[in-house]
From Swiss-Prot:
Its EC number is 7.1.2.2. Residues 14-29 have a biased composition (Low complexity). One of its GO terms (cellular component) is proton-transporting ATP synthase complex. PANTHER family: ATP SYNTHASE, ATP SYNTHASE SUBUNIT BETA, MITOCHONDRIAL. The gene is atpD. It comes from the Bacteria. F-type ATPases have 2 components, CF(1) - the catalytic core - and CF(0) - the membrane proton channel. CF(1) has five subunits: alpha(3), beta(3), gamma(1), delta(1), epsilon(1). CF(0) has three main subunits: a(1), b(2) and c(9-12). The alpha and beta chains form an alternating ring which encloses part of the gamma chain. CF(1) is attached to CF(0) by a central stalk formed by the gamma and epsilon chains, while a peripheral stalk is formed by the delta and b chains. The lineage of its organism: Bacteria, Pseudomonadati, Pseudomonadota, Alphaproteobacteria, Sphingomonadales. The keyword Cell inner membrane applies. It catalyses: ATP + H2O + 4 H(+)(in) = ADP + phosphate + 5 H(+)(out). Residues 1-29 are annotated as: Disordered. Belongs to the ATPase alpha/beta chains family. This is ATP synthase subunit beta. It comes from Sphingopyxis alaskensis (strain DSM 13593 / LMG 18877 / RB2256) (Sphingomonas alaskensis).
Amino acid sequence: MATAPATEKKAPAKKAAAPKAAAPKKAAAPKAAAPVGAATGRIAQVIGAVVDVQFTGELPAILNALETDNNGNRLVLEVAQHLGENTVRTIAMDATDGLTRGQPVRDTGAQISVPVGPQTLGRILNVIGEPIDERGPVNSDMTAPIHAKAPEFVDQSTEASILVTGIKVIDLIAPYAKGGKIGLFGGAGVGKTVLIQELINNIAKGHGGVSVFAGVGERTREGNDLYHEFLDAGVIAKDADGNPTPDGSKVALVFGQMNEPPGARARVALSGLTMAEYFRDQEGQDVLFFVDNIFRFTQAGSEVSALLGRIPSAVGYQPTLSTDMGALQERITSTTKGSITSVQAIYVPADDLTDPAPATSFAHLDATTTLSRAISELGIYPAVDPLDSTSRVLTPAIVGQEHYETARRVQETLQKYKSLQDIIAILGMDELSEEDKLVVARARKIQRFLSQPFHVAEVFTGIPGKFVPIEETVKSFKAVVDGEYDHLPEAAFYMVGGIDEAVAKAAKLAEEA
């Protein structure tokens, strides 16, 4: 498998690359050009996204990219299987409508490669690295194959430090690790995309390094909104004429949306990751890699799996589910050169966390943020379940003793309240002991205090977004579990930032009463 980090593209002489791109170019290895008179074949059959191609001479290798013309558009096919009788089975990266049997297909002699480097910043690309933002070609003279080996163990870094998000429930209960992998689990409509957009707002905008956003099988509208938000926030820079420019931009976007064929959705996460790896390995940067939604990567794999003739495994998923997931996730890691911190939204089919797709992702993650429908029904947003979310870095050695104890006491209070809910439902609050009544009152305040207004939701809610520093979060929750704010009404804790805002809101409520 090709593992070259980046390769020079044989192309007509162009303008010299910007001086700042010169340093990493030394590491780029020359790419073997597609052989002269490279193998050509003919389409034998087309079944949806899967195309069989028959060759007369040498067969292309597995994962090679083949090219054909489809009504004037370049269509890329990736070799998935050798069937015998000089036939290969391929997965199409775009719609196959209009293909005909007997149509010629050319072997490129290499894997699908995408542009990498500073010129990809501020651009929107598709799975095969073509720009889809109507702003002309990407002026990068470096490309990299989308399939690569994961870094060796000796090259990986194991330092643990916290990535502050400014979101109370996350920073307190399930903090994120720098250079770690984070999963946002949730069913349909509980707020995964809004949470990932808030994380982009809070982390990427203040982050000095580069971010890569891979939109995998999600709504085109959300991708469009995100692009315009980045433009407004200055994450994508503009030139003197007000047009987006790579110079000064901090984010590259790669989209393979819901309307794309499964081939594109199954590979677009790898295309985005390849761009992120370049910044990590060649420029030594700390990269943020956002994926929305990793479940669609699995779903696309299962769509083509049956067409490839594989026997389905549990719940109809592809038999190679954990291998496919591992091949992607093992590449998302921190090395001695730089780091990739990955935030992945993971759709949970029918709210069932034991479904093979989300369950396979769990094993790879450093922190899991589980979004609960029951909490969203209470109107508490972000609808993070504090008892079901976990983090590898929530240990006294990393977060400190005070933070660790506060988080555990908050969880303990909420767990006691959860166990008392059946009694309350049957007998009512009056049957509880005084001690239990106090636990319930505190737990309900904590529950509401874990809500927070988001910057990205400000246009819908009309409430200004809040970023809460981690020290203030710990101090506020410690005071609440210690009973310092038992005298404040529950409503004062809902949709505020720090504890000072809750006190001010309580005073305002008292005036209105």
